[in-house]
Regions:
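Auxiliary alpha/beta "docking" domains used to position bulky ligands
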Residues: 1-192, 364-376
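Iron-sulfur cluster-binding cysteine motifs and their immediate structural context
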Residues: 28, 198-221, 238-267, 332
Length: 381
């Protein structure tokens, strides 16, 4: 007979702790349990921000708030949600070469694959006991940060990330939705930010418009993923970022303290650890073919699986960090100022003009996207 055959015989406290211990032993740094009830607070926030246009076409959990805030959408018989946090805290290594683009920490390695495997260990135990279990990680089906908050793992920082007491926000989160009757957290963690506003003050585009509220229209992490023309107002602020932006976490006191305690030493030579993926060659992005780029960066979110958006980002970076006297920079911009794709050509035009390489600009042009870029050049700073 399995435990699920007679739920009334289960010692909920003992069984819950066994599952949490299994999660910790499987590599999770933090694990807790929340109710499978509708996440009303998150649903209201998603709907309000969507109606205000703060999502800027972003889909993910915004696509269907009624689904992403209801664990029973994933499992109709759900009673509990186990949520786990896996740390990816690692200090940023020095830039290896001058034409290198920065990558956010959470994609230095496939942390979500590690997270899923840990969550699957919990799910397997539940299933062997006769219960149902659905693993959700990096999934639009659930607002995992809100579940983690309800489970008592941490509080919402002013940068909207979940902050775990004594550890900060460098964590990926995932859930196991189950029909097992478990002991849920009795109350959330109290706010630990106090009067601190470092994340608000240090956001390069002032995208944190109020404590816990992000305007995706300004957020570099989203603008780097969003297809189309990269907003001119934020190109200079992009700096050398190719994918993601960690600025609001890099200044967060609990995150910084935890990183210093747990990370490998930043000035050790990068060998085969995750830090080897912290920087990407701009030259590689602009010269590699589609197949090679998707093979190397296919785990990233790339709109329509089109590496063009990586190249677009790389061209903006080239305009920000390139040297007009560098032969390679000139050759790359010359190549893309004559590229067949208008989106890429327009961003190369911006980069060339920013570096004062006006002789590379197209003499004749009939595409409206590029023409709009050329008309905007006097405002480029």
């Amino acid at each position: 007979m399995q435990l699920a055959d007679d739920p009334s015989s289960i010692d909920k406290n003992k069984y819950t702790e066994q599952l949490l211990a299994l999660g910790r032993n499987s590599g999770l740094h933090q694990v807790g349990v929340a109710s499978a009830e509708v996440l009303h607070r998150a649903r209201q926030a998603l709907n309000e921000r969507k109606s205000q246009g703060l999502h800027n076409q972003m889909q993910f959990t915004y696509r269907n708030p009624n689904r992403s805030t209801d664990p029973t959408a994933a499992l109709p018989s759900a009673k509990s949600v186990i949520v786990g946090a896996l740390s990816y805290s690692t200090q940023m290594p020095e830039q290896p070469e001058k034409l290198s683009a920065r990558v956010a920490r959470y994609v230095w390695s496939d942390y979500y694959a590690q997270l899923r495997e840990s969550l699957r260990q919990i799910a397997k135990q539940l299933e062997s006991d006769g219960f149902r279990a659905v693993v959700l990680a990096d999934d639009n089906a659930i607002v995992d940060r809100e579940v983690a908050y309800q489970a008592g793992l941490g509080w919402f920082g002013k940068n909207s990330n979940l902050l775990i007491a004594g550890a900060g926000s460098y964590f990926v989160l995932g859930c196991v939705v189950t029909n097992a009757p478990l002991v849920v957290a009795d109350k959330p963690v109290e706010d630990g930010c106090g009067s601190c506003r470092r994340c608000l003050d240090n956001c390069p585009t002032q995208a944190i418009i109020a404590p816990g509220v992000i305007d995706a229209n300004k957020c570099l992490a989203w603008l780097l993923q969003k297809p189309g023309v990269f907003d001119r107002d934020f190109r200079v602020a992009l700096g050398d970022r190719l994918y993601g932006c960690d600025d609001c976490q890099e200044v967060c006191p609990p995150t910084v303290r935890f990183e210093k305690r747990t990370s490998v030493i930043a000035d050790e030579p990068v060998k085969h650890d995750d830090r080897a993926n912290a920087w990407v060659s701009v030259q590689k992005i602009l010269l590699a073919d589609d197949e090679s780029l998707l093979k190397e960066f296919g785990a990233w979110y790339i709109a329509n699986r089109d590496p063009k958006w990586l190249r677009r980002n790389a061209l903006v970076i080239l305009g920000n960090i390139g040297d007009a006297n560098d032969k390679l920079v000139v050759e790359l911009l010359q190549k893309y100022c004559n590229h067949g794709d208008a989106i890429l050509r327009s961003h190369a035009v911006w980069a060339a003009a920013r570096l004062g390489l006006n002789h590379l600009l197209p003499v004749s042009e009939d595409d409206e996207i590029v023409l709009a870029e050329l008309r905007a050049l006097p405002s480029v700073k």
